[in-house]
Every structure is written in structure tokens, then in C-alpha cells.
Amino acid sequence: MTTNMDVDTFVAALAAKQPTPGGGAAAAVGAAVGAAAAAMAAAYTMRKKDRESGAAAAAEALIATLDTAAVLAAADADAAAYAELQRSWKDADMSTEEKAAIEATALAVPVALVERCHTYILAVQAFLPSCNPNITSDAKVGIHQLAGAARAAYQTALVNAPPEDVRERLRAMLREIQDIEEQLLELA
């Protein structure tokens, strides 16, 4: 599965004409890279003066929040959900209930990834004032990478025809993410 591939193998598999890994996996791996970049910035905010100022406690809290394994697992969950979707398209005898459950899972994976990216971005943004000033760019890279992953996961969610309330909730998160990015880029 995706989580066991090295970067070169994953990129080659993503570029190949095959159903998985696909866009959902790309979003998940991008989110993991973003979370890792932000976690690294937090790891460098553990100096003696950071401990004395309380910045190290903020860094430790951020590291505890950023679960790269969880976002990487979304890559495999996306592949499994897509395989089930393909099966549902081919199985004429499948019950309506089973098809609905498969479709719900296929939607839930990217929705959860957008939500997680949003949560992580808010956590990194809250950490920025405490971040070691020599490495804030890496924390910001984390935000931007997570933002891209959230937008990519949103596109995957849209393919799965979310209800309007889910779509609007995701759009609200993306708008908030966009506002954060614009502030970081000094575009706002």
C-alpha cells in the first residue's frame, strides 16, 4: 500500500495509468509532508530559552497534534474506498444499502482529510508566535502544504457528490484556510 512506498515509487505509481494511488493519496501524502514540516519547526523550538519562555510547551503541544501517520493512512483508506467503489459499479447484484455504505465511505475519507488539514493549519497558526524565529518559514511551509492538501482532498470529495451541507462546511474551512494563507503571504 501507499504508506509502505518510498517517495520515488509512490510518485511513479501516482503517474502510472492505474486507479490507485490517485488524487486522494496525493492529497494525503501532501498533508503528511506539511505536517512533518511544521513538526520540524516545532522540534527546533526546544532550546533552553524556549523552555524558559514557554515556547517549548507550545512546540510540544503542536507536535502532539500533528499526526503524520493518520494523514498517511488516509492514502491507503482512499485506495481501499476507491477499490470498493469500482466493485460497486460492476456488481449488479449489490444491494442498494451496500452501495450507499460504500459511497459514504468514499466520501468520508477526503472529508476527514480536509477536516484534519484544517485542524492542523489552525494549530500551526496558533504556534507561529512561539516558533523559533529562525525557522518560522518551515512552519509556514507546513501551513501551505496542508492548505494544498485540503484543497486537493476537497476536489476528491466533490467527485463523491457530497450533500450541500457537507459541501458548504468544507468550503467554509477552505475559506478560513485561504484567509490564513493570504495573511502569511501578505496578500490580505
Predicted regions and their residues:
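Residue-level recognition of alpha-helical structural elements
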Residues: 22, 26, 52-55, 67, ...
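A structural-propensity feature for long, helix-poor, extended segments
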Residues: 50-90
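Preference for long, well-ordered alpha-helical segments
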Residues: 120, 134-188
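Phosphate-handling active-site elements
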Residues: 37-56
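Short, hydrophobic/aliphatic alpha-helical segments
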Residues: 2-21
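Amphipathic alpha-helix face/heptad-repeat signature
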Residues: 29-33, 67-74, 106-116, 120, ...
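Amphipathic alpha-helical interface segments
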Residues: 78-154
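Conserved phosphate/anionic-ligand binding catalytic regions in large, soluble enzymes, centered on
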Residues: 16-39, 134-153
